[in-house]
Structure formats: structure tokens, C-alpha cells
Amino acid sequence: MKFWTVQKYATLNTVLKQGIYQPDFSKSWYASQGEDNADFYDCVRKYFNHANETGYPGLVFAFAQNKTNKYIEEFTSYVEFYQFIGSSKNAIKSLWKQIATPDACVLELEYDTTLFNPLFIDINDFQALMPPVMFMPPYTEENLHKVAENFYNGVIAPSVFPSYLIQAHAPFIKRENIVGVYPIFDI
């Protein structure tokens, strides 16, 4: 399945030189922005490792789509990804400002998802779980607990507030995972 991710060119260079990029949250600038953020991203890592019975030190965050709130689909081209991100501006604007830097690029990745559970989650649900957790409509304490439970167990369920932009998680980027490299863009 194809995933799309925003990464620094340094990450791409690591893959090209060493054959693999293995994320490590203990060394991540983004994951270390405040104790709550560090704890949250460590929790996401633990969820992934629980669902996959692995012990990875970090994860690659990537995107897929869900046009119907039922089935996860891949973006088939850079143009489709670009247009979908643009149309999802309200859901992703804050995150995009942080990751779409001049030293970043868009990577088109291919993974065999029969080998691992990518812990798919709607970006709105993921952001609702981020600290500080606040129960704001349409999220209630009950349905947010269900979102967290499903995420922990690697179950994708329809979102109560669907953006149709799906966050996926991968354990690494290997040279053979890279299908294409594209310029970053503003939204």
C-alpha cells in the first residue's frame, strides 16, 4: 500500500546512504516539544509495538485517505495527494505549518501492510487524542475513550468527526519503500 509522508531531506539522505531510516522518538525534535508531547508520542510508539508485537524506538508518520469513512485507500499520485491535502486544510493546517519546512520533501512510500498493522486513524481523531485532551463536540469522553481503545488495538473504526485524511504509521523507511520524491508545498 502507498503511504505519503513529509520528511526532511536529511532523512531521505540517510535512507539513500545507509539503506534504511529507523526513527527514534528519543532523538525526535517534534516528539520532544514538551513533556506531554513526548509522553503522547511514546504512547503511540507503544501502541504500534503492542499491535505488531515489535519493539521499534520510533515511527514514520504518513498519510492515506478514506473517502467514505469505511475503507482506507491510497493516494495514487502526487497530484491527488496535493489536492487532497489542500482540501483538508482545516484538519491539517497546524501540523502542516510545522512539518512543511524548506528542508522537507514529500515521499511516496510503498509497504506490504500484510507484514504490519499501520494503526490507521483519522487525523481528527488523532489530534483529539493529543494533549491536552479536551472533550469538545462532537467528541465525548465515551467516544474518545473508544477511539483510544481502537487505536491501541490497531482497529480502524469510522470517525465521529471524519476528515477523511488518514494517518498511518510505519516502522522505518527502507530504500525499497521509496517510490517517489516530490517537493514540499504550502496549503
Predicted regions and their residues:
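A structural signal for short, well-ordered beta-strand segments and their strand-loop junctions
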Residues: 3-5, 61-63, 108
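Conserved NAD+-utilizing ADP-ribose enzyme module
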Residues: 10, 23, 56-58, 67-187
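ADP-ribose/NAD+-binding catalytic cleft of ART/PARP-like enzymes
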Residues: 1-57
